Amino acid sequence: VEQPLIGEELWRGTLVDAPSVPRSFERVAYGVKFSPDGSAVALAVAATNGGAAHIELPFCEPTARGTRRLVSWLAVRASRACCVVVDGRSGAGALCDRLQELGVPRGYVLRPTADQAITAASLICESAGTGGITHIECPALDLSAATATRREIGRGGGWGFGGENSAPIEAAGLALLGLTTSKRNPKRKAKVT
C-alpha cells in the first residue's frame, strides 16, 4: 500500500479554528483542479496577510452538474484575487474560455505547465510540514490531504498527487502556487500614457 504524501497526522497539525481565521486578507489566489477523468472539479482558495497561507475548499463537486456556478464564482471575484490557476485535461480549457468570454482581467487565468504543477504539489507538501499553511475543518479537503499518494509526472523524476481523491489537495497546491508566484495585483490600476 502506497503511503500518502501528506497524511492525516501532518495535515491535522495545520488545522485552526474557524473563529481564528481573519475576515479579510491582503492577497488571495484560487486553484481549480479537474479530476483526471473529468468527473469532478475542486476549487481551493489560498490567502495570506504576510504570514502562513490559509487554505479553504469552497467548491468540490461532480462536473455532471456543470461548471456555470464555478465560472460565475470565479468571475465575480476576479477584481479581488491575484489569479486563478486552472489544471486538468478534461474541462480546464472550457472553463478558461468561459472566464475569458466574461471579460476577466488579463493575467487572472493561468494554466500551469507540467513543471509548475510539480512545484504546486511539492509546495503544499512542504508548507504542511513546516507550518507554512493553515486550514479549517473541511471533510473533502481533509480526506484528500490524508489519502492522496504520489503520482509520477513526466520522465524527469517529477511528481504530483494521485489516488482516487486527489483533486481537492491538488487545487490547494495550485492556489498556493498562484499566491506565491503571481505578480498580478488586483488593487493596482493601469496607467494610460
Language-model features: where?
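Hydrophobic/aromatic beta-strand patches that form the interior of the parallel beta-sheet core
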Residues: 30, 85, 108-110
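C-terminal nuclease/phosphodiesterase catalytic domains that cleave nucleic-acid phosphodiester bonds
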Residues: 44, 94-100, 107-193
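Structural beta-strand/beta-sheet cores of well-ordered domains, especially the beta-sheet scaffolds
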Residues: 27-30, 39-41, 82, 170-172
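ATPase catalytic-site recognition across NTP-hydrolyzing enzymes
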Residues: 1-32
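Acidic active-site catalytic centers that drive phospho-/nucleotidyl reactions
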Residues: 33, 87, 167
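Nucleic-acid-processing active sites and adjacent nucleic-acid-binding tracks
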Residues: 13-19, 37-90
